[in-house]
Amino acid sequence: MLVFAVGGQEFALPLGGIVEIARARTPTPVPGAEPGVLGIVPFRGAMVTVIDGRLRLGLPGAPMGRAGSMIVLRDSGELVGLVVDAVARVALIHPAEREPLPAALRLARTDLFLGVVPRRDGGYLFLLDAGAVLRPAP
């Protein structure tokens, strides 16, 4: 899984749909785009829809132009870029390490999460469902 940081928290996505990790660039806004869609950027001869990872994960947005990375994913043949604060590492997560979301967590969109992996510091690594992250809230 690819581990990355957004808003001071660590999240992870399965490697399967990830095409590339690129430097975040300022996208061209698209009129009428859904909330959280920052715009589009050219990428290797194609256009990538750029999504604000903070807003999609229910965190306060940050202004574009900040240092960050864009995780480019393929979803149903389309390229989508998820802007994150930083990419940390690739981690092997054993199924036995995965736990359900703690009931005490108050999350706006539980559909985004496959579960959590408890960390030694008492926090959690949040495991994300890539397909759900790329779709707007129902």
Give the positions of each predicted feature:
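An acidic, low-aromatic, low-complexity terminal/linker signal
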Residues: 1-138
